Amino acid sequence: MAGEGEEDVPRDAKIVKSLLKSMGVEDYEPRVIHQFLELWYRYVVEVLTDAQVYSEHASKPNIDCDDVKLAIQSKVNFSFSQPPPREVLLELAASRNKIPLPKSIAGPGVPLPPEQDTLLSPNYQLVIPKKSVSTEPEETEDDEEMTDPGQSSQEQQQQQQQTSDLPSQTPQRVSFPLSRRPK
């Protein structure tokens, strides 16, 4: 990203470009320089504002180098978190690794969730209402064998009507997976 309009670029932008180049960054968008400049200016303003507060607290007429150092140090301490020392991390890792892992109940392989919770299971249902027959159903041999000879014909008709009405009241639910389309 070098070359075009190099003489029109402000000094701060040239410094940012040289910093990027020294870090090994050769290809970047022009907006990157503007974003770094904005971050840089904002950081400097915050540090100088804090230095001015420290200077006023010390009843000094001007900001001096010690105020700026104190402001930078307070920014570093409170803005950027320092990782714990390596020894502390090793000690924490050793104490954590002493606890054995729980034994696996499942067999070998990857345990899968129940089928109803997977994306491969059918997630739809079709409701197929059963058509009610308006005419009297024909009696079959099975129906004749099941009838009690002691019942009157009227009681038999009521019993048949009740048995034929039950399946029509409950809809039948059907679910099936979609098959792949032939290519």
UniProtKB/Swiss-Prot annotation:
Subunit record text: Component of the TFIID complex. TFIID is composed of TATA binding protein (TBP) and a number of TBP-associated factors (TAFs) whose MWs range from 14-217 kDa. Interacts with TAF4B, TAF5, TAF6B and TAF10.
N-acetylalanine modifications at: A2
Gene: TAF9
Record carries keyword Glycoprotein: no
Subcellular location: Nucleus
Pfam families reported for this sequence: TFIID-31kDa
Gene Ontology CC terms, in alphabetical order: nucleus
Span of domain Histone-fold: 10-77
Predominant subcellular localization, coarse grouping: nucleus
Similarity remark: Belongs to the TAF9 family.
Residue ranges with Acidic residues bias: 136-147
Molecular function terms from GO: protein heterodimerization activity
Region feature (Disordered): 101-183
Role this protein plays: TAFs are components of the transcription factor IID (TFIID) complex that is essential for mediating regulation of RNA polymerase transcription.
Entry keyword Transcription regulation: yes
Protein's GO biological process: DNA-templated transcription initiation
Keyword field: Acetylation, Activator, Nucleus, Transcription, Transcription regulation
Low complexity bias: start-end ranges: 148-172
Tissue: Expressed in roots, leaves and inflorescences.
Protein name: Transcription initiation factor TFIID subunit 9
